[in-house]
Amino acid sequence: YFGSIPGSSSGNTQNTSSDEVNNKQKNPQMITMLIPWIIFWTATSFDSRIGAMIVLLVTALMPLIMRNVKFTIWDRISFALVGVLSVGIFMGGNGGFNLIIDLGYLAFGLMWLVSCIIKDPLCAAYVKYGYGGDIAYNNPLFMKTNYILAVCWGAMYVLTAIWSWLAVQNGVGSILIVVNNLVPICMGLFTAWFQKWYPAKMASGK
């Protein structure tokens, strides 16, 4: 009823404008997925309720802040998970704070692991754009490298959830400030090394 007549110039103009908008958007970036999680774990550690409000605000603004970047399914899932976890902290106060933080680690880890089950390693969804886009999925070496890294990151955060819960239950939760920041840094260094070493090693056949 309100649409343009098929074949008319106005219809072509609308399609062209839509294509131009899509072309202006940058390829997905992993930082889009990471920002809500980083702020969630950081802000809530200083003050649970105020931190939760900050996280909810940032999560709500992410589509605007990153309006020039395409979103992946993992970005959207992260927004939803972090939003739900933040509401839980805000509603529960300090009572269930530690449990919800642990659930956050678990959810983040499972997100990485599930991505491997559905044959789309989370990291590959972002890295592929440096290797030709979707065509990179046809490269067995690229996929295997990303499968390994996704499993490593997923397992690390699932284990983080477990040892964080055990540490709090045994009264040594204070060590988590160091451990839970040091371990991801070490994993990041490992990732930077592995993504170069492993493909080179496999390509050489040694």
What are these regions (language model features)?
Residues 37, 41, 79-94, 108-112:
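Small-residue-rich segments of transmembrane alpha-helices in multi-pass membrane proteins
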Residues 59-70, 195:
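C-terminal ends of transmembrane helices
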Residues 95-144:
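Membrane-proximal helix-loop-helix units in multi-pass membrane proteins
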